[in-house]
Regions:
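Amphipathic alpha-helical coiled-coil segments
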Residues: 56-76, 112-115
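Domain-scale macromolecular recognition modules
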Residues: 92, 97-116
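Short, charge-rich amphipathic alpha-helices with coiled-coil/heptad character
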Residues: 1-13
Length: 116
């Protein structure tokens, strides 16, 4: 089997980063819910420590988001360059790969808009 083309690699990279970004947002929501639950619970002598740990985890997750955004932007740029070079080379990649690549560009741009 032939190795995947640069277009396929760039496409899967964008899709992976979009999924990664979505999972970080889901993790943020879960951490915020755990913090609210800890704030409302009383009587636990370990609550202060748990609260500190959850807040630290929340801040660490928030700190990762700008990096993921930058990676998505860079991967989108590379994918768009691969689409363009494929067009200039007379369409070496299959039509299906090009369609998937364009869909990935749309998903990546949508994810960037949602982050903003």
């Amino acid at each position: 089997m032939a190795p995947p083309s640069k277009l396929v690699v760039a496409t899967s990279s964008v899709l992976r980063l979009v999924k990664e970004e979505a999972s970080y947002h889901k993790e943020l929501e879960q951490q915020e819910a755990r913090i609210k639950k800890l704030e409302s619970s009383t009587g636990d002598e370990n609550a202060e420590y748990q609260m500190k740990q959850e807040r630290q985890a929340l801040e660490e997750t928030k700190a990762v988001l700008p990096t993921v955004r930058a990676k998505i932007t860079q991967a989108l740029q590379q994918l768009e360059e691969q689409i363009e070079s494929n067009k200039e080379a007379g369409g070496e990649a299959s039509t299906d790969d090009v369609v998937k690549a364009k869909d990935a560009v749309a998903e990546g741009k949508k994810a960037l808009r949602e982050i903003s």
